[in-house]
Amino acid sequence: MSVENVRQFFKKYHLENRIAEHENIGDTVEHAAELLKCEIKQIAKSMTFIVAENPVLIVLAGDKKVDNKKFKSTYNSRPKMIPFDQVADRIGHIPGAATPFAIKSDVKVYLDVSLKRFETVFAAGGSTNSTIELSIDELENYAHPLDWVDVGKD
């Protein structure tokens, strides 16, 4: 999938023009924050895991890492990240461009409570040089998460 898939996804909500394409690459939260001139914590970081053989995408604030104990308590398994070379096949986006939009139908999406600190966040737009700024309500509405979770390290 690509920025065009994400653009098509948002077209049905008339938000496709909010996807910004940048000259430089923002494939890490640090690069994205520098590119957008915002704080790292305002980047909606998508992390991909395998839970009970299923692909899971968790969106956290950019300044958070996954807490192994919280993850195990939430999902009844230790965190196992999807290998780098399998992310595109399992999720539908390449590493550094993963986003909860225009993903494969079997991916389970969760939003971490660390995002609730902000009015808006910047999510990847389907490529390493595209982003979309969304309010937390918009993120929740369009990402279609199964639930809010608390798996970020304090």
Question: Locations of the language-model features?
Answer:
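Extended, low-hydrophobicity, polar/charged segments
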Residues: M1-D154
